[in-house]
Each structure stands twice: as structure tokens, then as C-alpha cells.
């Protein structure tokens, strides 16, 4: 995780990786099916906005803090019923919120009733681009960094 730009790629390669996986950077592409509001949350975020939260099943997740997460912390989002039974280990009577509703609302852009999961570097997203532009940018950044280090880029 945490691979966003050429420095991150170079760091992973210096550790012996043959390749990297990039995810967060593609959320703010035109082709991503997340709502414009969801994408804008990434663009508007700062490093300090990103936090680790607990899911109703006890697993940690990284998310961009906002109204919904604040209300969860205040105990205001506890579900009164469970219409979905989507996760066997989820006990809605003890859950701080309904994860399926939070994720659905976030995907639709209703971030007062959901939140944006993200990678550690989501705050580095600055604009909406195309997948093509993002890939070309990564390739050119990486190739330039390899040349500076006297290495051959294999793309």
C-alpha cells in the first residue's frame, strides 16, 4: 500500500519489488464509477483528514474523516435494525454503524451518511484525470527517475 508516485515506485523497487500495485490514485479518474462528491472528497482532503477507523466487524480501515465518522464516534449512527445481514460476524445491536449503508451512501455521494475509504496518500490527489493520463504520468515519472539513477525502466 501507499504507492502513489514515482518516489513510492522507486522505493518499492529499491526494496526488491518487481512491480507495484497502485489503487488510490485511480479513484480520482474520470473512469472511476465513484460519485463526483466521493472523488472531490479525495481532492479536498489533507494528510490530517485521513484516519484509521474500526468497521462493524472489527477490522480497521483507512478513511477520510468527515461528518459521518464524527457522528459514529459520538454514538449517533447505531443501527436500529439490520435489513441486509450482509456479514455473518456483524451484530447490529453492538455495531457503531451499518457498513453496507455507509458504503452505499458514500458511493452515491451522500457523505453525511457514509464515508470514503482511502489509501494513505489520498490527500495527494489534486484533480480529476483520465486513466490514460494517470498511467502516462506514472510511466514518465518512473522512466525519468530511472534515468537519473542510471537504471533502465521496464514498463
Q: Where do the model's predicted regions map?
A:
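Conserved active-site-proximal phosphate/metal-binding subdomains
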Residues: 4-155
Amino acid at each position: 500500500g501507499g504507492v502513489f508516485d514515482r518516489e513510492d515506485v522507486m522505493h518499492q523497487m529499491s526494496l526488491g519489488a518487481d512491480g507495484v500495485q497502485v489503487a488510490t490514485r485511480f479513484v480520482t479518474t474520470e473512469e472511476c464509477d465513484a460519485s463526483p462528491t466521493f472523488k472531490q472528497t479525495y481532492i479536498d482532503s489533507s494528510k490530517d483528514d485521513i484516519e484509521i477507523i474500526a468497521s462493524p466487524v472489527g477490522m480497521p480501515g483507512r478513511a477520510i474523516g468527515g461528518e459521518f465518522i464524527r457522528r459514529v464516534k459520538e454514538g449517533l449512527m447505531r443501527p436500529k435494525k439490520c435489513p441486509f445481514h450482509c456479514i455473518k460476524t456483524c451484530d447490529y445491536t453492538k455495531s457503531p454503524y451499518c457498513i453496507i449503508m455507509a458504503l452505499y451512501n458514500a458511493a452515491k455521494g451522500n457523505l453525511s451518511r457514509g464515508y470514503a475509504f482511502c489509501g494513505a496518500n489520498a490527500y495527494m490527489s489534486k484533480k480529476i484525470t483520465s486513466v490514460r493520463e494517470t498511467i502516462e504520468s506514472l510511466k514518465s515519472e518512473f522512466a525519468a527517475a530511472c534515468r537519473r539513477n542510471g537504471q533502465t525502466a521496464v514498463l
